[in-house]
C-alpha cells in the first residue's frame, strides 16, 4: 500500500474509531440548517444535497488565509494558484470543471466579470475578514441560480451589524512570505481590517475596511528573481432600516481593488520569464435589497450595479471595462411545512468594452418546489427558462429526491439528483482581444449524482457522493476559442466525515476522487485529502492542525508546450489562538507548510514554503 492509501485509510479509521469511543458526557448537538440548495432554512436531514458550510468560527480559525485558500480545503474543490505567489491567477477546478462553471453570490447577488475570459468572479477581490459564513453547493444549480452554475455555487454572506449601538472589531496580522528555498523569515505580509457597526432603533449599519499587502516572493520560480508585491484595499458600507415587522430595506456600496506585479512572456522569445509586468483590478458595486414578509411567505428583490476596470501592463497589455446590472425578484411561500415554493424572475444586463462596446442580456423566469414528507420522502425540483438575447431560449431543470429514516439518535438518508445547466459563451470569448469567435455555441452540462449520509445528535456525520458530469460543446482554446467536437465526461467520488462529540475536540476529513473519462484536464488532481483536528484546551487557548494531500497532476510547460507529470505533495499547517481581556482580545499564530515541503503547483511559478504569521483581533 502506497503512502497515499495509508493516509486516506488512517484518517477514515481514526474517525470511525473516535465515533465508537464518543464521550458519554457529550452535549447533544443542535440540528444543522442549510439554505442554499432551496433558499429555505431546512434541516440538513431534509436536504437532498451535501451542502458545505463554513461558519464564522471556522473563518476565525483561518485568519490570515485568503478566501481561496480556505475554500481549497473542502471536498470536490481544487483552487489552483492558491499556494503560489499572492497575485497568482486562480483556477476554480470543482468537480472537474473550471472557472466559467462556478457561480459566486455575495449576499444573494450574482457577481461576475463580463470582461474576463471565463466570465467568473475574481476571488482575489474578497476580504475574508468581512465574511460571516459561506455555503457551497456542488453540482448543477442553474434552476435556482442561472447561467454558469454548472459545477458549484459559492454563496457568501457578509457580516451583519451588531445589536449594540456601536461595536468595533479590528484585526492586524504580520508575517513572512517566502519560498521553500528562502527561509530568512523577513516580514513581508501585512494584513489589516476594521469593522464599525451597530444598531440605533430600527436603523442598522456596518462599515468595513481592509488592506492586504504581501511582498517577498516572485511569480516566476527562482529566489534571485525580482519580488512581485500584491496590494489590495476593500471598503464597504451597508445600511438597513426595519420599517415594520413585515418590511425591511437594506442597501450597500463597496469599492474593492488590487494591484499586483506579475511575470510574463516577453518578446522576442515569448518564454515565461521574470518581467516588470503589472495587473490592476478595480470593482465598484452598489445595490439594494427590499424584503416584504407576509404570513408563511415573503417577497424579496436583490438588485445591484457593478463596474469593473482592469488593466494588464505588459508586452501583451490590455485595458478592460465592464458593467453589469443584476436583478433577482422572487416570492417564497411555505405550505404547512410540507411544500416550500419559490417563483422568481432574474434579469441580467452585461456590457464590456473591447474594440467597441459589446453586450447581452438575460431574462429568466424560474420555479422551484421542495416537498418534505412525514414518512421520509423529500423532493427538490424546479425549472428555469433561460432567455438569452444572443442565443435564444433554453430550459434547464433539476430533480433531486431523497429519503431519510431515523437511526438511533440520528438519521440516515439516501439521495440523488439529475440536473442540467446552460452556459452561453461570454463577451470575451465572442469579441475579446485574444482569439474571439462570434460563432461559438453554448455549452450544456448534465450532472447525475447519488449518495448516502448518516448523522447523529452527538456530533458525528459521514457522507459519500458519486457523481458523473457530461459536457457538450465544451468551449476550449486552441489558436482561438472553439467548441470541442467530443463530449467530455467527468466521474468522481466525494467522502466527508466530521466529529464534534468528544469534549473540546473537533475532527473533520474529506477525500475526493476526480477523473476525466477521456483526455486531460490540466492541474486537476485525481486524488485529494484534507484533514483537520482542533482542540480547545481551556476557555482561552485553542489549537488546530490541517493536513492536505494533493495527488499527481498534469501541467503544460509553456516553454516547450509539452505536458509534464507533477508529483503529489503534502502540506501541514498549524494554528494557535489565545483569548485575553474577557475575550475582547485574541492573539493568534499561523504556521503554514510546517515541514517546508518543496513542490510545484504550476510549472515555472513559485510556491510558498514554510511561513509564519502573528496577529491580534480586538473587539470593543
Predicted regions mapped to residue ranges:
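Conserved C-terminal beta-signal and adjacent last beta-strands/turns
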Residues: 6-8, 21, 85, 197-200, ...
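N-terminal periplasmic "start-of-domain" segments of outer-membrane beta-barrel proteins
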Residues: 32-62, 91
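Extracytoplasmic beta-strand/coil segments of soluble accessory domains associated
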Residues: 68, 72-110
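Short acidic/polar hinge/loop motifs at secondary-structure boundaries
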Residues: 111-138
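Gram-negative outer-membrane beta-barrel transporters
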Residues: 171, 375, 466-470, 484-557, ...
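Periplasmic-side early beta-strands and strand-to-turn transitions of outer-membrane beta-barrels
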Residues: 171-187, 191-277, 552
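Structural signature of Gram-negative outer-membrane beta-barrels, strongest in the C-terminal barrel
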Residues: 244, 336-342, 346-469, 502, ...
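Outer-membrane beta-barrel signature, preferentially recognizing the C-terminal barrel domain
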Residues: 268-289, 293, 415-500, 521-527, ...
Amino acid at each position: 500500500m502506497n503512502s497515499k492509501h495509508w493516509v486516506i485509510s488512517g484518517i477514515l479509521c481514526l474517525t470511525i474509531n473516535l465515533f465508537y469511543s464518543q464521550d458519554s458526557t457529550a452535549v447533544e448537538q443542535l440540528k444543522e440548517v442549510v439554505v442554499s440548495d432551496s433558499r429555505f432554512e431546512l434541516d440538513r436531514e431534509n436536504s437532498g444535497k451535501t451542502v458545505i458550510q463554513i461558519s464564522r468560527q471556522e473563518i476565525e480559525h483561518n485568519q490570515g488565509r485568503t478566501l481561496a485558500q480556505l475554500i481549497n480545503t473542502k471536498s470536490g474543490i481544487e483552487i489552483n494558484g492558491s499556494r503560489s505567489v499572492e497575485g497568482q491567477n486562480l483556477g476554480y477546478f470543482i468537480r472537474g470543471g473550471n472557472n466559467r462553471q462556478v457561480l459566486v453570490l455575495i449576499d444573494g447577488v450574482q457577481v461576475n466579470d463580463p470582461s474576463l475570459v471565463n466570465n467568473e468572479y475574481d476571488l482575489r477581490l474578497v476580504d475574508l475578514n468581512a465574511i460571516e459564513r459561506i455555503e457551497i453547493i456542488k453540482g448543477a444549480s442553474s434552476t435556482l441560480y442561472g447561467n454558469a452554475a454548472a459545477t458549484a455555487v459559492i454563496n457568501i454572506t457578509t457580516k451583519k451589524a451588531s445589536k449594540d449601538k456601536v461595536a468595533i472589531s479590528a484585526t492586524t496580522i504580520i508575517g513572512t512570505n517566502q519560498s521553500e528555498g528562502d527561509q530568512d523569515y523577513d516580514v513581508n505580509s501585512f494584513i489589516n481590517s476594521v469593522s464599525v457597526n451597530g444598531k440605533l432603533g430600527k436603523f442598522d449599519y456596518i462599515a468595513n475596511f481592509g488592506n492586504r499587502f504581501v511582498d517577498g516572493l516572485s511569480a516566476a520560480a527562482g529566489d534571485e528573481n525580482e519580488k512581485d508585491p500584491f496590494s489590495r484595499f476593500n471598503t464597504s458600507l451597508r445600511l438597513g432600516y426595519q420599517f415594520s415587522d413585515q418590511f425591511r430595506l437594506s442597501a450597500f456600496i463597496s469599492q474593492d481593488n488590487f494591484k499586483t506585479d506579475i511575470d510574463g512572456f516577453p518578446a522576442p522569445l515569448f518564454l515565461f520569464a521574470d518581467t516588470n509586468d503589472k495587473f490592476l483590478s478595480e470593482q465598484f458595486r452598489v445595490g439594494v435589497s427590499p424584503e416584504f414578509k407576509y404570513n408563511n411567505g415573503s417577497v424579496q428583490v436583490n438588485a445591484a450595479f457593478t463596474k469593473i476596470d482592469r488593466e494588464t501592463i505588459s508586452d501583451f497589455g490590455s485595458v478592460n471595462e465592464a458593467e453589469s446590472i443584476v436583478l433577482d425578484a422572487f416570492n417564497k411561500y411555505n405550505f404547512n411545512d410540507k411544500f416550500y415554493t419559490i417563483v422568481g424572475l432574474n434579469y441580467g444586463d452585461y456590457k464590456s468594452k473591447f474594440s467597441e462596446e459589446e453586450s447581452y442580456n438575460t431574462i429568466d423566469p424560474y420555479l422551484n418546489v421542495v416537498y418534505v414528507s412525514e414518512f421520509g420522502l423529500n423532493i427538490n425540483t424546479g425549472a428555469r427558462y433561460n432567455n438569452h438575447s444572443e442565443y435564444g431560449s433554453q430550459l434547464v431543470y433539476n430533480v433531486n429526491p431523497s429519503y431519510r429514516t431515523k437511526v438511533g439518535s440520528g438519521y440516515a438518508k439516501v439521495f440523488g439528483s439529475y440536473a442540467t445547466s446552460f452556459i452561453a459563451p461570454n463577451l470575451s470569448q465572442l469579441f475579446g482581444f485574444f482569439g474571439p469567435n462570434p460563432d461559438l455555441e453554448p455549452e450544456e452540462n448534465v450532472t447525475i449524482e447519488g449518495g448516502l449520509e448518516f448523522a447523529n445528535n452527538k456530533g458525528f456525520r459521514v457522507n459519500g457522493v458519486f457523481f458523473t458530469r457530461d459536457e457538450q460543446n465544451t468551449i476550449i482554446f486552441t489558436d482561438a476559442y472553439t467548441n470541442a467536437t467530443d463530449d467530455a465526461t467527468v466521474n468522481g467520488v466525494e467522502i466527508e466525515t466530521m466529529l464534534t462529540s468528544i469534549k473540546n475536540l473537533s475532527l473533520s476529513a474529506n477525500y475526493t476522487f476526480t477523473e476525466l473519462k477521456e483526455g486531460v484536464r490540466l492541474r486537476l488532481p485525481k486524488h485529494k485529502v484534507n484533514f483537520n483536528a482542533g482542540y480547545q484546551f481551556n476557555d482561552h487557548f485553542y489549537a488546530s492542525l490541517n493536513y492536505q494531500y494533493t495527488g499527481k497532476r498534469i501541467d503544460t510547460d509553456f516553454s516547450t508546450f509539452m505536458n509534464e507529470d507533477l508529483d503529489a505533495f503534502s502540506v501541514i499547517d498549524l494554528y494557535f489562538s489565545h483569548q485575553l481581556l474577557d475575550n475582547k482580545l485574541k492573539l493568534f499564530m499561523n504556521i503554514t507548510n510546517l515541514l517546508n515541503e518543496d513542490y510545484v503547483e504550476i510549472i515555472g511559478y513559485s510556491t510558498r514554503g514554510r511561513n509564519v504569521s502573528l496577529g491580534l483581533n480586538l473587539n470593543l
